[in-house]
Each structure stands twice: as C-alpha cells, then as structure tokens.
Amino acid sequence: MFLQNMIIQDIQNGDGVCFIDPHGSDVQDILANIPQERLEDVIYFDPSYTKRPMGLNMLEYNKEYPEQKTFVVNELFSIFQKLYGGNPESMGPMFEQYFRNATMLVIEDPATGNTLLDVSRVMTDKVYRDLKIMRCKNPVVVDFWKSIAGKAGGDASLENIVPYITSKFDVFLANDIMRPVIAQEHSSFNFRDIMDNKKILLVNLSKGRLGDINAHLLGLIIVGKILMAALSRVDTPKNELNPFYFYIDEFQNVTTDSISAILSEARKYKLGLTMAHQFIAQIDDGIKDAVFGNVGTISTFRIGSDDAKYLENQFAPTFTAGDIMNIPNYNCYMKMLVHGVPTDPFNMATYPAPEGRPNIVEDMKQLSYEVYGKDREEVEANIAKKYRK
C-alpha cells in the first residue's frame, strides 16, 4: 500500500516513474489510477504475455557513449554472478576471461548480432566467431581469440570452456517466454527517453508466471539499463533534467553491487531510488553496506527481533527495538533526509491505495502490447535466421 501510494502520487504529479513489481498485483492497482491525461505515457511490460513480446536487450548501448560497452560487459558478468553465485566453482577466473571476451567480441560489432543469443553463438559457431573477429576493432579482444583461446589446450581449451558458459545462457534462450524477449536486437523502449520525457514504466515480473530465475534476470537487466541511462545524463545540465523515480520491491533479488553506484552517483542526475524488502538477512553484505551507507530516508513497518536490533541505531533515541517490533498494523516509523538534513524519527499511518478505475486496466495493457510489442512469429523468424547455415 505504501509503495503504491507513493508511485500513484508521483504519477499524478506528472513525474517519470519505473516500478518493478515481483508479484504482478500492485501494478494492476497503479494502472487503475493513471490519470486520463497520462494514459499515453504508460509502458506496461509483462514478459509473460507471449503474443506480442517486447524486447529487452542488455547488450544494446548508445554508440555516442562508447564507455557504455565496458559498463555492459561488467554489469552482465555481475548479473550472472548474482544468478549463479551459489555455484562459485563454475565461475572462476577462466570462466570470467572467456565470458568477458565473448561478450566484448559480440558488442564490438552490433550489426552482425548483439544479443545474449549471439554470446552463446560466438562460443559454439566457429564461422560466426571468425566473422566477429574479422570485424572486431578491439586488438586486445582479437588477440585473445586468436592467440589464447585458439591455441589453448587441456582444461583451458575452448571446447572445454564452452559448456560452462553456454549452459548458463541456454537456460533462458531455450525458454519460450524468455527467448523472444532477450533475443531481440533492439529493446522495445529507450530507457533514457523514458527518464527524460517523464514516461511511466510498470514492470510485471510475477514469479508465479515467469519462474524465479527468469524474473530475476529481467529485473537485473532493467536495473542495469536504468543505471546506464541515468549515468548518460551527465551530458545535460542538472537544471534541465527532469526528476525520475525508480521503485523496486524485493530489491535484493534484482540488484548487483552496482546498486552502490546508483545510490552514490545517480542522485546527481535526478534519479530517486526507493527500495523495499522484507528482512535484512535477504541482502548480501556488500549490498547491505552500500544501502545503509548511502540511503537518505528509511522507513520500517513491524519487523522481527534481529532486524529491529539492527535498525535500532537508525531510530534511537526516539524509538527502541521493542517499539519497532510492536508497530501497529498499517503504521510505520520514518526517518527522512530533507534538504540534506536528517529529521527526527516519527511514526506515520498509511492508507490503502485508491480504487481508481479498474475498468481501464485491460485497455491500457493492450495499448502497450500494440505500441511496444512485436508479433511473436516475426520475432521467432528473425531468431531462426541466425541458425541457418
């Protein structure tokens, strides 16, 4: 309810918003509260709607900002570390070396394919790999594929490394829901345009329909794209930037260590970030330190004893751990940063989101599918072309 009301207020104020909903229910209530004059600003992204899939390409970058290539490679590797970190022995230094060089080889020449599908192809298809090498202008990457990968034997041989990398891509590429989304050459919406022009991006990542790992991958990609778009705003004077508000529920599942960059850097580019989660043990130590070391405003509803003890220093001396453990339903404690100055903590009552106009929700979804989606048969045909010899 709290997040919903904040998002609805931003939308009603005419601001740009992105919301990642891991449940799929909150976005329905938000859609019902879109003002009439903002209906055309809405982009509703539901990857489980397969008739007209929308593209989301992590490897896509703006050629006017060549530094984005390095960001894409680093962020993609961080994403796969996040997804497969439970099995660290499969992602050692050799895996990283091949992974980074395969990704760099692909993005050096977008014209010959620039998706996650093509990273997998460049590992398995020698003809395609040779084409990429011929067109690659990065001498370090070319040297790796010719002098190191091409001559390595034993455990370091290309044939031995390939399954370790492609198996991690194939989980998504073989999935009938995911493939038409992540294998499109161009994302269906431009994140910089969304931020600059006050668009409303509502992302439905319902795990029940997508599965955990698929939902997490898409969420991680969107967070990376938002960060990349925010950092590219360095070319615009601050007084000309429109503020943009980014909301993430269950953020621990869709953030890498780059969240520290969002918290410390992106505020310069008028990106406001609001993150919600259920308990602190969900968060990796590195991300936890980045979050609590950078956030300006903290709000807590009733929580358990361990989390209450952890947060007590944030709310003392006004509230104790015992107070935090006994907050009434629909109430919270809040500590804000106002004009760079911390306020004293205070308690606050929250209210349900307004009912809005539920009758407009399905029409708004269909509008997004028509404007931003592509016919599935067309998408699958374009993908199939890449496998024709």
Question: Where do the model's predicted regions map?
Answer:
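P-loop NTPase motor core of the ASCE superfamily
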Residues: 78, 90-94, 261-264, 281-389
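Active-site-proximal loop/turn and secondary-structure-junction residues that shape catalytic pockets
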Residues: 207, 252, 279-281, 305
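P-loop NTPase motor domains
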Residues: 1-271, 287, 324-328, 332-342, ...
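Conserved H-loop
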Residues: 22, 276-282
